């Protein structure tokens, strides 16, 4: 692995400082060009470096931090459900903000991938799309949540529209769950991909929440089609005509 000096442009990487830029050498038959580019980007990502310094399990933690700094929807004393929680970055951030503890956990996460234990977090190792998952989440939390978070995304195929549709489906399922369980005035945050097929989802969110925002935090890579839908202040008294998104 070759290291060269590169000047950063500020942010988490430092303000106008110099850092070592790491290049990955290609050995015949060992790594593709696209994989090498991804690895170089990952190794030189200032958010990746900062996550190690701050003890977060992923750079995604900063996406939630940045969104909350702007909209301040996470507060001390809230109850949180985190869908697609692996490797645990969002659970770490939300748990710290709401003051969750092992004695009185306020955060419940779920993922089919294993997540190592986190202080103040109850983690369910199961697929959220399983029919038993919604009730198990509520049972684990012991009450309705104030906030439902979802950073779920389907494995990418490389085909932009296919990836968008698959991730929007997960967002729809997460939204339906949120509409079913949130406390009055609760909030919903979920990952989506830009692609134009989320009109039904947006209509439903606007009918059931006071405000809905499209958010692309600085920690989301500029070239990524990723964005987040933030729905604030759940209108619990709104009558839902039907369950639009089925598990």
From Swiss-Prot:
InterPro entries: RNA_methyltr_RlmE, RNA_MeTrfase_FtsJ_dom, rRNA-MeTfrase_E, SAM-dependent_MTases_sf
Annotated Pfam families: FtsJ (PF01728)
Presence of the UniProt keyword tRNA processing in the record: no
EC number: 2.1.1.166
GO cellular component terms, A-Z: cytoplasm
Catalyzed reactions per annotation: uridine(2552) in 23S rRNA + S-adenosyl-L-methionine = 2'-O-methyluridine(2552) in 23S rRNA + S-adenosyl-L-homocysteine + H(+)
Class of the enzyme per the UniProt entry, highest EC level: transferase
Protein's name in the database: Ribosomal RNA large subunit methyltransferase E
């Amino acid at each position: 692995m070759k290291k060269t000096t590169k000047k950063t442009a500020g942010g988490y990487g430092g303000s106008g400082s110099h850092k070592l830029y790491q290049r990955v050498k290609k050995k015949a038959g060992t790594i593709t060009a696209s994989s090498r580019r991804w690895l170089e980007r990952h190794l030189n990502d200032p958010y990746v470096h900062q996550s190690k310094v701050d003890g977060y399990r992923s750079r995604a933690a900063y996406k939630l931090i940045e969104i909350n700094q702007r909209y301040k929807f996470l507060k001390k004393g809230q109850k949180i459900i985190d869908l697609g929680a692996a490797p645990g970055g969002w659970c770490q951030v939300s748990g710290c903000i709401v003051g969750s503890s092992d004695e009185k956990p306020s955060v419940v996460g779920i993922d089919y991938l294993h997540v190592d234990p986190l202080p103040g977090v109850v983690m369910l190792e199961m697929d959220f799309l399983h029919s038993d998952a919604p009730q198990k989440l509520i049972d684990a939390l012991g009450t309705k949540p104030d906030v439902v978070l979802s950073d779920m995304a389907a494995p990418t195929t490389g085909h932009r529209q296919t990836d968008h549709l698959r991730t929007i489906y997960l967002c729809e399922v997460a939204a339906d769950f949120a509409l079913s369980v949130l406390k009055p005035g609760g909030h919903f945050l979920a990952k989506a991909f830009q692609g134009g097929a989320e009109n039904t989802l947006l209509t439903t969110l606007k009918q059931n929440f006071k405000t809905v925002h499209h958010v692309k935090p600085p920690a989301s890579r500029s070239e990524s089609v990723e964005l987040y839908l933030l729905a604030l202040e759940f209108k619990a008294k709104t009558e839902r005509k039907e369950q639009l998104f089925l598990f």
